[in-house]
Amino acid sequence: MINFKKMIPLFSANYQKLQCFLLVLLSMFTIKIGVIPAWNSVNSDFPNYYISARLLTEGADFKNVYDDDWFNAKIRENGIEQQGKFSPFPPATAFVMLPLTPFSPLTAKRIWTVVNIVLLGANVWLLQKITGWQLISSANFLLLSGIGLINNFRFGQLYLLLLFVILLSYRCVTLRRQTAAGGLLGLGAAVKYVPVVYLAGFAINRNWRTPFAGMLAIFGVTAIEIIVFGSDVYRYFFAEVLLPHLDGRLSSQDTYAIAFQSWNTFFRHVFVADVASNPAPLIDWAAGYRIGKLIVTAAVAGLTGFAMWRLHRTNHPSRLALDLAIIGIAAMLLLPATATYHFLLLAFPVALLLSHLRDESQFSARFLILGSYAAIGFVTLIPFTRWKYSGWEILLAFPRLWLMTVLFGAAIWTIRNDRRDES
């Protein structure tokens, strides 16, 4: 694997003091804006995870769990004064916080914050093992995920846990424990969907034990869901929650919300009129929404397929890692609705990309990849979601989407021009 220190001067031994300064600066920022607020408040998605687990331990009827009004009433009954909902989570999400249900909401949040800190350290260690980077470089790399990491702490989210599952699964593969890797990805996919794309990546590389074990894990969790929650709840989830979610439609949330930073939201703003949310689209042509999504999806899929074909045609020594990298980045680019903490998951594919490409002469492309990754982490410090846009100004409303597009393009370009891919 390429030495990360040679790729970016910041990570050279000559810049050790600068690395230490960056580590202290990013750590202090994360603690002040993320960890301390997490310790002192119960907000955003944590109540949704916690209350769903409490309902499970209390034997509540889960048939109403996707009724936002009913779920909000349960949140208030537990002394939490905020709006919440269980949608769009799969039923299995209720299992995650079961160990914390004996505690009060604030105590449970504090315990989960400590767990997240431990998970951050574990992810740094796994990243170092996978990439061969120094520990301080791995730590800085994860801290550069910025607001995504901070909001994972603040909101009591699960994405450090999911990143841990993904990194550990890849580590298992490198240790030739493919079945364990698949089982981990399957368990992760039962709660959050992204790990499914990595199961597909292993299947493309004919690493059959990993996707087979992953699918068994998914089917096993699904069977448990049906037994515990009932088939009606699962059918409702599939038809009324999952399918609308894949189209960027989430209950009690505006489908035009700029905060989603997705192609779905962008094309809605450009093409689809709405009296309240989008009275004057750039081009009033409702069919353009579907056509635009189809074109982008086909382009991303085509370029991803081309990059993977090239890796396999030239028998690239790191084709599995680079396949997973490009699939992961493509999946993040096409997500129908995103939040800051989702982009913690970018750490895995971007780290694979940077550490496994062989041509050390492509400094500018590598710098662009790392720069895009860091910019995605901090771009939401700009309050672009609060501004009003009209006409062509709507193009300025989606900076994270454009940064993701740049990252994807740089990844494709770098793989295409990797001069040491024929070995």
Give the ranges of each region predicted by the language model.
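Short, intrinsically disordered terminal tails adjacent to the first/last structured region
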Residues: 1-11, 414-423
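Primarily membrane-embedded glycan-assembly and transfer machineries that use lipid-linked glycans
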Residues: 2-180, 205-327, 332-333, 339-340
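Aromatic-enriched
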Residues: 28, 352-423
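Hydrophobic transmembrane alpha-helices
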Residues: 104, 192-195, 349
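Transmembrane alpha-helices and membrane-interface helical segments
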Residues: 122-126, 164-175, 201-206, 210, ...
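A cytosolic-side transmembrane-helix exit/cap motif
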Residues: 159-162, 182-185, 232-241, 363-370, ...
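Membrane-interface alpha helices of multi-pass inner-membrane proteins
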Residues: 179-203, 327-334
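Hydrophobic/aromatic-rich transmembrane helices and adjacent perimembrane loops
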Residues: 339-354, 399
